[in-house]
Amino acid sequence: MTHPLVPPITDLAIPVAEQLGLEVVGIVFHTNQRPPVLRVDIRNPQQDTGLDDCERMSRALEAALDATEIIPDAYVLEVSSPGISRQLVTDREFISFKGFPVIVSTSPPHEGQQEWIGQLIRRDETKVYINQKGRVIEIPRSLITRVLLHDGE
């Protein structure tokens, strides 16, 4: 069942995307998480959808949502592209994709695991922090081989 806020959010998101030369592919509002997660999937009809497209849409939609106050409480906005499989490397990418689902691969294994899946919290000089079902996992950067955006729910 579609969340009741999805239709007004969609009505707001479509013109925002069109102004940026993008299309809204889908919108899902996950209220079973705290804070709730608003996921907006976009595509660029002119070329492969890239990180810059997601960043531009995220900034523009966030401003529009804040101005209208459609969502009354705190939430996390995720803007992505269906099928995007992107390795995060730069500080800018880690900041832009805060709150997004990621897969962190380590070698050797960290605490007995070589792959960690969770929501990206942040990265500092020594660690990457992810939220895994409400638990903060701190993974030493020296062990990390890659951090990828994760498509899975």
UniProtKB/Swiss-Prot annotation:
Predominant cellular place of this UniProt entry's protein: cytoplasm
One Gene Ontology cellular component annotation held by this UniProt entry: cytosol
Keyword vocabulary terms for this entry: Cytoplasm, Ribosome biogenesis
Keyword Repressor carried by entry: no
UniProt-annotated location(s): Cytoplasm
Keyword Cytoplasm recorded: yes
Pfam families: DUF150_C, RimP_N
InterPro entries found in the cross-reference section: Ribosome_maturation_RimP (IPR003728), RimP_C (IPR028998), RimP_C_sf (IPR036847), RimP_N (IPR028989), RimP_N_sf (IPR035956)
Domain of life: Bacteria
GO BP of this protein: ribosomal small subunit assembly; translation
Annotated function: Required for maturation of 30S ribosomal subunits.
Family under the similarity heading: Belongs to the RimP family.
Annotated protein name in UniProt: Ribosome maturation factor RimP
Organism per entry: Trichormus variabilis (strain ATCC 29413 / PCC 7937) (Anabaena variabilis)
